[in-house]
Amino acid sequence: MSKVHVFDHPLIQHKLSYIRDMNTGTKEFRELVDEVGMLMAYEVTRDLELQDVEIKTPVTTMTAKRLAGKKLAIVPILRAGLGMTDGVLSLVPAARVGHIGLYRDPNTLKAVEYFAKLPQDIDERQIIVVDPMLATGASAIEAINSLKKRGAKNIRFMCLIAAPEGVEKMQEAHDDVDIYIAALDEKLNDKAYITPGLGDAGDRLFGTK
């Protein structure tokens, strides 16, 4: 069974309160999502493999630690996932970025893929899938299905808030994918929106309705 990591760091929770607030404007909302994405990425990448390298400081030579060179890819689920991408890239600027476009059918609530553009060597990369919300789980599950069909194996999912229903569905569908979230909310309402939630992340990021 995959692990669910809920981040209780004070800075994340502080910023998340403003992300949730309906009075937070588009510019501030976008900046906050970017910042929380960066803070979360710090923990999501905690176990990246290191290797020893010999360097010379102004004083002497020494053995230091650097990333072992394992390839990393960030895959935002369009369009809201774009809001978290730059935050992760600020920590790992050499990572490749793929994109998967999905929309939720309002009648069936199922995710439908309309776009996918990924690094050619996606099967060799450690992957962080990002999307601000995990509601029904349909989009995340379909995105990870798409990645696995292309040979991806080492996948993690990162989001701001999640509903218990979505977490359960994700674990049932992909028990090998760890889930990283800033907050686990109460439930989905009758329209499949996370409650208390933060509204529509894509609309709030891009100023659309």
Curated annotation (Swiss-Prot):
It is an enzyme of class 2 (transferase). One of its GO terms (molecular function) is magnesium ion binding. Allosterically activated by GTP. Pathway: Pyrimidine metabolism; UMP biosynthesis via salvage pathway; UMP from uracil: step 1/1. The keyword Cell membrane does not apply. One of its GO terms (biological process) is uracil salvage. Belongs to the UPRTase family. Pfam families: UPRTase (PF14681). InterPro entries: PRibTrfase_dom, PRTase-like, Upp_B, UPRTase/APRTase, Ura_phspho_trans. This is Uracil phosphoribosyltransferase. The gene is upp. 5-phospho-alpha-D-ribose 1-diphosphate binds at residues 79, 104, 131-139, 200. It comes from Staphylococcus haemolyticus (strain JCSC1435). Its EC number is 2.4.2.9.
